[in-house]
Amino acid sequence: MNESRWTEWRILNMSSGIVNVSERHSCPLGFGHYSVVDVCIFETVVIVLLTFLIIAGNLTVIFVFHCAPLLHHYTTSYFIQTMAYADLFVGVSCLVPTLSLLHYSTGVHESLTCQVFGYIISVLKSVSMACLACISVDRYLAITKPLSYNQLVTPCRLRICIILIWIYSCLIFLPSFFGWGKPGYHGDIFEWCATSWLTSAYFTGFIVCLLYAPAAFVVCFTYFHIFKICRQHTKEINDRRARFPSHEVDSSRETGHSPDRRYAMVLFRITSVFYMLWLPYIIYFLLESSRVLDNPTLSFLTTWLAISNSFCNCVIYSLSNSVFRLGLRRLSETMCTSCMCVKDQEAQEPKPRKRANSCSI
């Protein structure tokens, strides 16, 4: 009798151990079951790399704006700074799934951690996407209404717009705490998020109709019309050159492309990157919530592809701004100059005499 009870107890322990191991080794890309290290290595490397790039890139943008007061005179800088702060917090928040993949306990119930993390990331990405749309509207007004632009876009209105963006982003994902469904797949690193917190077709449609679709439409509409205006300006310039040929015009044509064409190329890159990173996520979000497709690998890849937009934002929107590039160059020169001054001071200070066999540069 005792032996039979002991056998049953061992079987139960072994089965529970197998379940725990499978739960512990479940990795989003399906490369779990590591026999040597109990870590989702590939997923951890991807998230850590993205976290480092997002934090480093957006910290650079924030630091340049802080040290270059000239940038504050441009209305676009309000949205770029807001986007940089939101994307920076996205990078910091990405440390949470990294710790989960490394199997560090958060000290909080997994369901609560999953819900809070998913909500925060969704809000931050919403702020970032709304800022992208506002930047496109700002550039559209600057080109289509240059005379009344200063009256339409004032610092006070910009601050109100940024506050409304944060409030709207916080409210639109709030129903996820009241059983409406999962707001995204950012928390699917957690086991509870992936298996117990399901998406809802109605809530997904609600988010897409009130956030993703309007932002994508605004970006596409404004940049398409800006691109169209740039082409029209280029055509008018070429017509004037044909009517009034001169040596200066010919030489300027040979030296490089017109500013309108360069600006159009910047807009093309911005729009292309935006849709390449966000469109796969939105499509999968709709298909999975409609129970048409369910693939953890696609969920992981599309989610972190969209999150990588937080790094691409600071690269494209900042480096495409000539004033920002100037501020970054001056900041780099200042830092290099200060380093050289420190080295010169150290060189001028008397140093103890070195022995003959010591190394000196």
From Swiss-Prot:
Tissue distribution of the protein: Expressed in brain, especially in striatum.
Protein name per Swiss-Prot or TrEMBL: G-protein coupled receptor 52
UniProt KW Transmembrane keyword: yes
Regions of this protein lying in the Extracellular compartment: 1-44, 109-116, 181-203, 287-296
Keyword hit for Disulfide bond: yes
Entry's localization field: Cell membrane
GO cellular component: plasma membrane
Signal peptide: none
Pfam families linked to this entry: 7tm_1
Keywords in alphabetical order: Cell membrane, Disulfide bond, G-protein coupled receptor, Glycoprotein, Membrane, Receptor, Transducer, Transmembrane, Transmembrane helix
Cysteines joined through disulfide linkages: C114-C193
UniProt-listed GO biological process terms: cellular response to light stimulus; G protein-coupled receptor signaling pathway; locomotory behavior; phototransduction; response to xenobiotic stimulus
Cytoplasmic side: 66-87, 138-159, 225-265, 318-361
Main location: membrane
Membrane topology: Multi-pass membrane protein
Function: Gs-coupled receptor activated by antipsychotics reserpine leading to an increase in intracellular cAMP and its internalization. May play a role in locomotor activity through modulation of dopamine, NMDA and ADORA2A-induced locomotor activity. These behavioral changes are accompanied by modulation of the dopamine receptor signaling pathway in striatum. Modulates HTT level via cAMP-dependent but PKA independent mechanisms throught activation of RAB39B that translocates HTT to the endoplasmic reticulum, thus avoiding proteasome degradation.
Known glycosylation sites: N2, N13, N20
Family: Belongs to the G-protein coupled receptor 1 family.
GO molecular function: G protein-coupled photoreceptor activity; G protein-coupled receptor activity
Transmembrane segments: 45-65, 88-108, 117-137, 160-180, 204-224, 266-286, 297-317
SUPFAM superfamilies documented for this protein: Family A G protein-coupled receptor-like (SSF81321)
